[in-house]
């Protein structure tokens, strides 16, 4: 078992920063030189939007990240390293907690409604925490949202809509709101990404601000804070960046 301990401070703009730590979204952060994704849960992507209880769009991905940062504050965090991320080998899977607390960050995020359990890696864990958040409409559950995995796949037509604010019979209209191609850039996340439909499915291409194609991309499907984030979701760099 590998254990890392570090302090985490809240930052209000861009990725949350502290000495040796960067929080990129609601379930991923870097401790020293190791990037951890929290085991068994799935938080909104940093550029993901959700609908609130009134049906209005709000930046739930940024909010989930900021709530995690605020919860930790300046307290020390411990991460138990569970091995490499099967999706992106440069990241590690972690079960993390504030050093003096028994509740893990994984559990806290699901219980407070800022993440959902992620099967099959959850292996049945976090069901009680998710049920509690759903019944009490905490966090994401107050409105309507798509599972983060569906956003990553850009599963516009088949995305599962969940939350207390989802309206039966309005699924198509809701999906159009949630899968937007004009989403505003999250603070500190300037990398534009487009999805192109190919015979084998969608291909994701990202454009750095230094790329010749950057200004020509007017309507981005996705935004990323770093190249690592884009690569972790299967996007490739635009040819104009080479």
What label would you give each PLM region?
Residues 1-4:
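Positively charged n-region of N-terminal signal peptides that target proteins for export
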Residues 44, 67-75, 112-116, 129-132, ...:
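Structured segments of extracytoplasmic/periplasmic soluble domains
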Residues 64-68, 101, 105, 110, ...:
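Stable alpha-helical elements in mature extracytoplasmic
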Residues 13-15:
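N-terminal signal peptide c-region/cleavage motif recognized by signal peptidases
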Residues 48-60, 119-138:
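Short, surface-exposed secondary-structure junctions/capping segments
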Residues 116-124, 135, 139-242:
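Mature, structured domains enriched in cysteine- and short glycine motifs
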Residues 17-114:
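Electropositive
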Residues 38, 109, 133, 206-207:
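Bulky hydrophobic/aromatic "packing anchor" residues in well-ordered structure
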